[in-house]
Amino acid sequence: MSNGRILHTMLRVGDLDKSIKFYTEVMGMQLLRTNENKEYEYTLAFVGYGDESQGAVIELTYNWGKTEYDLGTAFGHIAIGVDDIYATCDAIKAAGGNVTREAGPVKGGTTHIAFVKDPDGYMIELIQNKQASAGLEG
């Protein structure tokens, strides 16, 4: 399966409009497409930084009438590479986003990271782009 690629990550959300607004207006993504299933009572919205054929996106799943989920302890976070982590955090805060860990070096290392929380409590790690492809280096 060496020719596979990650297509999307699915997050269950309690308020689809609020989540779309967060990912588009706060995180700077585009709403790529939506799909409503009346028979099974759910709506999907796909958001990302570009066309789905070029990279992974986020699938926001809204199950009609369900406003809250127990996130549990298994899921960690989504990671996004950014060009200027400090300016990105400032822009997120200015747009009303919740930066839970300010930008700075990872403990014991030099990679610069920050964390943001989305409206449903999912964590998003921001990694300075020049360091994102290398992972978390010391």
Curated annotation (Swiss-Prot):
VOC domain location: 5-129
Keywords: Lyase, Metal-binding, Nickel
Entries under InterPro entries matching the protein: Glyas_Bleomycin-R_OHBP_Dase (IPR029068), Glyas_Fos-R_dOase_dom (IPR004360), Glyoxalase_1 (IPR004361), Glyoxalase_1_CS (IPR018146), VOC (IPR037523)
Cofactor note: Binds 1 nickel ion per subunit.
Active site per the UniProt annotation: 125
Lyase listed as a keyword: yes
Pathway(s) annotated for this protein in UniProt: Secondary metabolite metabolism; methylglyoxal degradation; (R)-lactate from methylglyoxal: step 1/2
Positions contributing to substrate binding: 12, 63, 77
Any one Gene Ontology cellular component term annotated for this protein: cytoplasm
Entry EC no(s): 4.4.1.5
SUPFAM superfamilies cross-referenced by the UniProt entry: Glyoxalase/Bleomycin resistance protein/Dihydroxybiphenyl dioxygenase
Molecular-function GO terms, alphabetical: lactoylglutathione lyase activity; metal ion binding
Residues that coordinate or bind Ni(2+): 8, 59, 77, 125
Protein name: Probable lactoylglutathione lyase
